[in-house]
């Protein structure tokens, strides 16, 4: 699948961006207060759908964790990539821990 037709309209998000067990250096993109333990691709798809964002699963492996089978998610872009990541992180945290 070519991703050129999605450029500018969608962002690619990896579950590792939201993983509390990883450091920023290892790929986490959100503060620890918003991160959760080992998020899955399925969880990200559910959270995006709950927020009204179109999302599609992609195949692939995170380069820093090539042994991990969790693939990325293509998510509709609303605002900047940082804003989309933060929005998903807050909802993921709320669903997981009720905070």
UniProtKB/Swiss-Prot annotation:
GO CC terms: signal recognition particle
Name by which UniProt lists this protein: Signal recognition particle 19 kDa protein
Coiled-coil annotated spans: none
Function: Involved in targeting and insertion of nascent membrane proteins into the cytoplasmic membrane. Binds directly to 7S RNA and mediates binding of the 54 kDa subunit of the SRP.
Pfam family, one: SRP19
Subunit structure: Part of the signal recognition particle protein translocation system, which is composed of SRP and FtsY. Archaeal SRP consists of a 7S RNA molecule of 300 nucleotides and two protein subunits: SRP54 and SRP19.
Superkingdom as given in the UniProt entry: Archaea
Gene3D superfamilies reported in the protein's UniProt record: Signal recognition particle, SRP19-like subunit (3.30.56.30)
The encoding gene: srp19
């Amino acid at each position: 699948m070519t991703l050129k037709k999605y450029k500018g309209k969608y962002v690619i998000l990896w579950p590792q961006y939201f993983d509390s067990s990883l450091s920023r250096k290892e790929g986490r993109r959100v503060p620890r207060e918003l991160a959760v333990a080992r998020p899955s691709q399925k969880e990200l798809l559910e959270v995006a759908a709950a927020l009204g964002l179109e999302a599609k699963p992609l195949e692939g492996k995170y380069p820093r964790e090539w042994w991990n089978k969790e693939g990325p998610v293509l998510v509709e872009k609303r605002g900047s990539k940082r804003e989309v990541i933060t929005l998903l992180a807050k909802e993921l945290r709320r669903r997981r821990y009720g905070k």
